[in-house]
Design a protein with these regions (language model features):
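ABC-family P-loop ATPase nucleotide-binding domains
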Residues: 79-137
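Conserved ABC transporter NBD signature motif
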Residues: 57-68, 72-73
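ABC transporter nucleotide-binding domain
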Residues: 167-182, 186-247
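The feature captures the beta-strand-to-loop junction immediately N-terminal to the Walker
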Residues: 34-36
């Protein structure tokens, strides 16, 4: 559905933000896109949406070239930016103006999402609302577009804890086999139990792109056990609750993915983790 092939992008001639990037996003998945600030996560989403253009390489989105900004492509992509545009419209007027750009837009689903987010009236003026309330409205609208590709940049910024739970439930229910949802965030805890594929960027490159099932098949997440010496330790982190470890899963044990721990392990020991995944892929 989305294919990056040897993509280069830079905002200046001196520093490349993305270099020789190869990456694919397939439908039927909620992809988590993680990376430190400045890695190029937002840029990657904007390239997919046709808001930025690569300087080198080939990028295809639903068999379209995003830089051409074909209407047939744009009506099936919704991009939710981190910084929300300023709107003075009421919610009802916002729907009236923007929904026609998306042929599969569901007014019923929009209403359901607003209700879930506890937004009681479409008469509210958007410029009178808090940042969190605006974010809820734009998220609800994005889900209601029912586009094949839904791009979300830091969608949980501004949401309180109950609203984050509502967000996860709605996004999970919005996924189907034909839809590709990509969520970029640095708040990794917000993606727990939601994503089924994880992409981690480091040094402006793809450090990891694997399903959650594959990650937990090859890596073991555990609290340190002094009596166990069987699993090679890749990364350790001291916390008030003990020493948490990422190990090579040599015995095929079950464990729950800790996204934050994995992210820190990638930053600290990327080559060793990549070797585990590449080696086991080659053996298959």
């Amino acid at each position: 559905m989305i294919h990056f092939e040897k993509i280069d992008f830079s905002y200046s001639s001196k520093v490349k933000l993305l270099s020789d990037m190869n990456l694919q996003f397939e439908p039927g998945h909620i992809h988590g896109l993680l990376g430190k600030n400045g890695e190029g996560k937002s840029t990657l989403l904007k390239l997919i949406a046709g808001l930025l253009f690569p300087q080198k390489g080939k990028l295809e989105v639903m068999n379209f070239t995003p830089a051409k900004r074909m209407p047939e492509m744009l009506r099936d992509i919704y991009f939710l930016p981190e910084e929300l545009p300023h709107h003075t419209l009421s919610i009802a007027r916002f729907q009236q103006v923007y929904a026609p750009f998306y042929p599969k837009f569901s007014a019923e689903l929009f209403d359901d999402c607003l209700t879930e987010f506890e937004i009681p009236s479409k008469d509210w003026k958007m410029d009178k609302l808090s940042y969190g309330q605006k974010k809820k409205i734009i998220v609800a609208f994005g889900l209601a577009t029912r586009t094949k590709i839904l791009l979300m940049d830091e969608p949980t910024n501004g949401l309180d804890i109950p609203s984050k739970g509502q967000f996860r439930r709605m996004v999970a229910s919005a996924l189907d086999e034909n839809r590709c949802i990509i969520i970029s965030t640095h708040q990794v805890r917000d993606l727990d139990s939601l994503i089924d594929n994880l992409v981690i960027m480091d040094n402006h490159c793809i450090a990891l792109n694997e399903t959650i099932e594959t990650i937990t098949d090859r890596l073991l997440f555990r609290v340190q056990d002094a009596d166990r010496k069987d699993a090679p330790i890749i990364y350790s982190e001291n916390t008030l609750r003990g020493v948490f470890q990422v190990c090579e899963n040599v015995n095929g044990e079950d464990s729950k993915l800790d996204i934050e721990l994995l992210f820190n392990a990638i930053i600290a020991n990327k080559k060793q983790i990549q070797k585990i995944f590449n080696h086991q892929t080659e053996k298959k």
